[in-house]
Amino acid sequence: MITQQIMSRITDQNVQDIIDTAAAGGITYWATEPTDEEFAGLPEGKEYTIVEGTAPHPIFAFDDVREVDSVNYLSKDDVRLAYTKLLDPGQEYVNRELHGYILDSWRDRTEADGIDAGHIDAGAADVIVQVACFDEVRYG
């Protein structure tokens, strides 16, 4: 019940802002750009393709193989649920600093705009995406 109430306050634009922040620098150390085939595999009801793995190194030839550990397809509600899990005062996913950014975004929410995604930096966006993908923080 409470989870649904929290999730309903996170707008589609809030989710997109979190994903954009993560893609711009939050997840780039553990995730790589999806291929056309991975994008094409997007199931109905899912909006985002997150590939856990590494791309070939742009300079060093000895590291020229793309490695994929998993391909994760997320819906907006998957991201909302991860945010909700991280908002919980008793959460054990992240340290107090990252938790504080998430709390600040919730505290400064408005009826019209949802949460204040301006508080979600690359580190916070990273852990939101990790919890959405893996239900844990594996990296960082």
Identify the residue ranges that each predicted region occupies.
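A motif-centric signal for short, conserved binding hotspots located
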Residues: 98
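Long, contiguous N-terminal structural blocks used for assembly/anchoring
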Residues: 1-73
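Surface-exposed polar/charged interaction patches
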Residues: 21-25, 29, 85-93, 108-113, ...
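Alpha-helix initiation and N-capping motif
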Residues: 12-15, 76-79, 122-126
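Long, low-complexity intrinsically disordered regions enriched in Ser/Thr/Pro/Gly
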Residues: 69-95
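Acidic, proline/glycine-rich low-complexity IDRs
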Residues: 114-139
